[in-house]
């Protein structure tokens, strides 16, 4: 049995508390975000921009510290059974909601049952399928009360899993596993997220939300670690225009930008080198391909041709100014729990001119004459994405494919894709919720809202189902590698780049540490004078 207690992490937390405790005169931080959240109902969220907001408002059983290590949150300790199928959490008795109510085990049970209920329509429900009966509940085959999570008593919560899940603790840091204030949700329904109504249990509570302007939060005085939260007020400002965040950062109006304009990288490296943070990031930038019924894009040879002709080195080095790496797989390099030599597109090392010749041959084989195919390249508003799609349009000309650009508003962009919106080729990105290949490969399973191309492949789904219940981790890794091999052959989505995180962080901000998932909760930060 594996046992973790709060005392085991006390040294790490004490060091953080010491940093956070360096309170300065300035207690308000203004943080740039990629876009506004489409919702503050964490069961309906799906983007990184939304997760940043949720991480400040709520606290899960476990949380990620400044280095993104899993540390105690509402749970002060936990035990894992020898077979890896049972996780038992002991909740701290001083955890409280922002209205002073105690946080109890039933708050987690209520939330987890709600997210699995089909009527909730939670796009992230399937991320919790490792929990016993979760998938059956999400598909309507079983009742929410049958979910493998139990409030043993007010301060003890037990999970039962289908199979050993090496990333389960990391998964519990995700917004899909956060608790809910039952009384407020029951009384207010969908209005529970409104300022003045919303009750949260994290380091901060919601004060106001003005779309396209800012979200304002203030310290939750009932938070169990409030004494070590150094920043009293957080203002999250949306910046779909990354250059606007840069300008306001230089003016001293914003202390942190979560992304930066790649075309101004040389300027920032010269003038803001101490504030510019570029670090490895667990994410893939990719191009889902769909097309209308009868479109040549439905032919995998056409998709393969498009993928072959893309000069990923140029896009990474010139468009993104060496802040990205060329990507030839959906699962990013360096991920945990995978095979030693992961699958990759087999033309990664071929000369680009040779690839263009092969691409033209594939198009001819598919019956696509030169100049006969026009595709629309859609992307969410950002100069970085616009420049990427402009470069791709030029590359497609080399094999006789015409392309037009379609810029879409960012806040509802991914909702449009999740709801099955029509498109030819779009840009998308996926940042790992946990370090496991499953978190990238599940995106293309049948029935998953994140399967933007609505691609269906029975063999692929069967392999992913098999991996989910395979207890031998080596066998599990190979099964998922077999699934990715199918994915890379069919290319319903074209891997393009491997992410790096790019941020501007004021020298006044203390406690910020680069980490692979690029998670930076405000509670770990402080501001120097």
PLM regions and their residue ranges:
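N-terminal lobe/hinge region of extracytoplasmic solute-binding protein
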Residues: 32-82, 197-200
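Aromatic- and charge-enriched surface segment that lines or borders ligand/interaction sites
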Residues: 77-124, 158, 248, 296-298
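Alpha-helical secondary-structure segments
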Residues: 104-111, 154-160, 164, 202-203, ...
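Gly/Pro-rich hinge or "lid" segments in bacterial periplasmic/extracellular proteins
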Residues: 140-146, 150, 154-155, 163-229, ...
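Extracytoplasmic/peripheral linker and loop segments enriched in polar/acidic and small residues
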Residues: 149-150, 316, 352, 402-414, ...
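Ligand-site clamp/hinge motif
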Residues: 189-195, 221-267, 282, 393, ...
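Structural transition elements
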Residues: 326-365, 382-387
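Long beta-strand-rich cores associated with HINT superfamily self-processing modules
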Residues: 503-529
């Amino acid at each position: 049995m594996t046992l973790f207690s709060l005392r085991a992490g006390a040294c790490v937390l004490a060091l953080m508390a010491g940093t956070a405790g360096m309170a300065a005169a300035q207690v308000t931080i203004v943080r740039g975000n990629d876009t506004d959240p489409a919702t503050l109902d964490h069961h309906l969220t799906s983007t990184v921009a939304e997760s940043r907001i949720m991480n400040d408002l709520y606290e899960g059983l476990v949380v990620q510290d400044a280095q993104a290590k899993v540390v105690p949150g509402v749970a002060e300790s936990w035990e894992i059974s020898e077979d890896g199928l049972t996780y038992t959490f002991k909740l701290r008795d001083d955890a409280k909601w922002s209205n002073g109510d105690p946080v109890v085990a039933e708050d987690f049970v209520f939330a987890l049952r709600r997210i699995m209920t089909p009527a909730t329509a939670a796009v992230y429900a399937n991320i919790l399928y490792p929990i016993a009966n979760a998938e059956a509940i999400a598909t309507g085959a079983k009742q929410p009360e049958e979910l493998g999570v139990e409030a043993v008593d007010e301060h003890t919560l037990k999970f039962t899993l289908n199979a050993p899940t090496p990333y389960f603790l990391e998964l519990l840091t995700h917004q899909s596993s956060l608790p809910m204030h039952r009384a407020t949700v029951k009384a207010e329904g969908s209005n529970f997220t409104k300022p003045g109504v919303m009750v949260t249990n994290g380091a901060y509570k919601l004060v106001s939300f003005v779309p396209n302007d800012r979200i304002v939060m203030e310290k939750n005085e009932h938070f169990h670690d409030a004494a070590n939260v150094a920043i009293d007020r957080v203002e999250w400002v949306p910046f779909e225009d990354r250059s606007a965040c840069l300008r306001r950062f230089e003016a001293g109006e914003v202390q942190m930008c979560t992304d930066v304009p790649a075309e101004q990288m040389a300027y920032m490296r010269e003038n803001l080198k101490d504030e510019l943070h570029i670090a490895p990031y667990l994410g893939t930038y990719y191009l889902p391909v769909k097309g209308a019924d009868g479109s040549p894009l439905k032919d995998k040879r056409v998709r393969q041709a498009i993928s072959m002709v893309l000069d990923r080195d140029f896009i990474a080095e010139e468009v993104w100014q060496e802040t990205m790496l060329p990507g030839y797989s959906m699962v990013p390099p360096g991920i945990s729990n995978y095979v030693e030599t992961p699958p990759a597109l087999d033309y990664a090392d071929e000369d680009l001119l040779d690839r263009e010749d092969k691409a033209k041959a594939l198009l001819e084989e598919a019956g696509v004459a030169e100049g006969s195919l026009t595709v629309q390249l859609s992307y969410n508003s950002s100069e970085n994405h616009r420049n990427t799609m402009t470069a791709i349009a030029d590359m497609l000309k080399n094999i006789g494919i015409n392309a037009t650009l379609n810029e879409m508003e960012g806040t509802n962009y991914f909702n449009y894709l999740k709801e099955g919106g029509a498109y030819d080729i779009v840009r998308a990105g996926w940042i790992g919720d946990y370090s496991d290949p499953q978190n990238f490969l599940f995106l293309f399973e049948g029935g998953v809202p994140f399967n933007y191309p609505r691609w269906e492949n029975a063999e692929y789904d069967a392999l992913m189902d098999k991996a989910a219940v395979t207890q031998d981790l080596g066998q599990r890794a190979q099964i998922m590698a077999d699934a990715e091999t199918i994915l890379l052959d069919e290319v319903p989505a074209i891997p393009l780049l491997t992410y790096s995180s790019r941020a501007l962080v004021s020298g006044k901000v203390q406690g910020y540490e680069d980490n692979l998932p690029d998670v930076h909760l405000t509670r770990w930060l402080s501001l120097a004078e």
